[in-house]
């Protein structure tokens, strides 16, 4: 499984949000998409997920053009947006059953049981979504993104606003997903990248200013990631 992004661009009027970025990802990697607020991370993820058209450039997932064949591509893409709207009046298990029908999943009961165990939602499955903590809502959002067992998982700020214990649990969950898929998650929190990522993409003012394994980036600049980030985004 591979993802190839080539010369991807997007503007809003005269404002360039994403400026001809290119990169190549493969299965088994947890890749951090790092950049300050407004760098273009969310716009890029929306285009990769097939929810926003690009102005130019291409996105191919295992040879499938995402925008020219969005229905087929979305079958193997999971996406958790930064502002994830959940049906708060539904029960957790009820919501997952609804999503199973949307994705036409076979063996629904088996898949939901597996997913609840994988995401640590066992004690919450019979509770209303509106009563869940921020951490459990994020778990449910991730469960919703991976219910159809996608090969590309895009997570937009999945650890934002979580307490330290929730952070550890969500990090472990994200890492576990990389066994079966390409994982790309955006963040502006440097500790998240160093904690769980193999590789980092750094976006600044819509341009890709770094794309390499974290170990090589640290070795090249001979300093910590915080100083490297300041250097790349100023």
Where are these regions (language model features)?
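Conserved ABC ATPase "signature" region
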Residues: 97, 101-124
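ABC ATPase "signature
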Residues: 211-212
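A short, surface-exposed alpha-helical micro-motif characterized by mixed small hydrophobic
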Residues: 193-195
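Conserved ABC transporter NBD signature motif
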Residues: 57-68, 72-73
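Catalytic Walker B motif of ABC-type/P-loop ATPase nucleotide-binding domains
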Residues: 153-157
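Helical segment within the ABC ATPase nucleotide-binding domain
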Residues: 167-179
